[in-house]
Curated annotation (Swiss-Prot):
Disruption phenotype: Loss of circadian control of gene expression; KaiA and SasA protein levels are unaffected, KaiC is constitutively phosphorylated. No growth after 24 days in a light/dark regime. Loss of circadian gene regulation, cells arrest growth in a dawn-like state. Severely attenuated growth after 5-7 days in a light/dark regime, glycogen degradation rate is normal for 2 hours in dark, terminates at a higher than wild-type level.
Annotated consequence of substituting residue 53 to E: Activates promoter activity in vitro, cells switch to a dusk-like state in vivo and elongate
Gene Ontology cellular component list: cytosol; protein-DNA complex
Biological source species: Synechococcus elongatus (strain ATCC 33912 / PCC 7942 / FACHB-805) (Anacystis nidulans R2)
One GO process term, biological-process aspect: regulation of DNA-templated transcription
Pfam hit, one: Trans_reg_C
Molecular function GO terms recorded: phosphorelay response regulator activity; transcription cis-regulatory region binding
Regulation: Negatively regulated by LabA, mainly during the dark.
Name of protein: DNA-binding dual master transcriptional regulator RpaA
SUPFAM superfamilies: C-terminal effector domain of the bipartite response regulators, CheY-like
Amino acid sequence: MKPRILVIDDDSAILELVAVNLEMSGYDVRKAEDGIKGQALAVQLVPDLIMLDLMLPRVDGFTVCQRLRRDERTAEIPVLMLTALGQTQDKVEGFNAGADDYLTKPFEVEEMLARVRALLRRTDRIPHAARHSEILSYGPLTLIPERFEAIWFNRTVKLTHLEFELLHCLLQRHGQTVAPSEILKEVWGYDPDDDIETIRVHIRHLRTKLEPDPRHPRYIKTVYGAGYCLELPAETELHQHADQFPSAS
């Protein structure tokens, strides 16, 4: 069965351009021209991926994305946001709303197709060999792939697909600085020239879930000019850190 993609964009020229190229690449494409219709179609069809313009009539893309993430029927569908704005704050707001990746208009068709393939691969909407199947653990952190969960100081933390992949990437290289280009290639599946803000927003989300004080991270550290490093205490040191977290209920 062909992967199904829902494209939501009020620009009819862009909508047709995207749809034609996706169909030529073997995808089943459905279309909507405003946020309300797009959200309704997403719930009805439960597509494999949603391409969502941010500046939509009736209901904007930010709101649509938030609603999709709150609905259990659509919460796990990868969302590729489309924006003509290209400003950092708009990208940040899109990621905060729950988008997985973004394309700034105008974009090259090949770049669009590459990002679509990467999102589908990463969420197992099409087969790939890189799926994590084994539990990974060090010190207070254990990652459980089948449920996209982390056990963190004996507490269960639910992660999005992206958060899980990002944390897995850092945990595999525990104690090492991981460059942004390496993170993008492994987690997002592509290697753009400059996409640091994408990583920064998702690192912030991880810190909110794992750090006792996200503004002063103790475990997920920024190595300025070089990348990010996950530093975890060994088993023998856990008692020195456990008091930062409330007792599990």
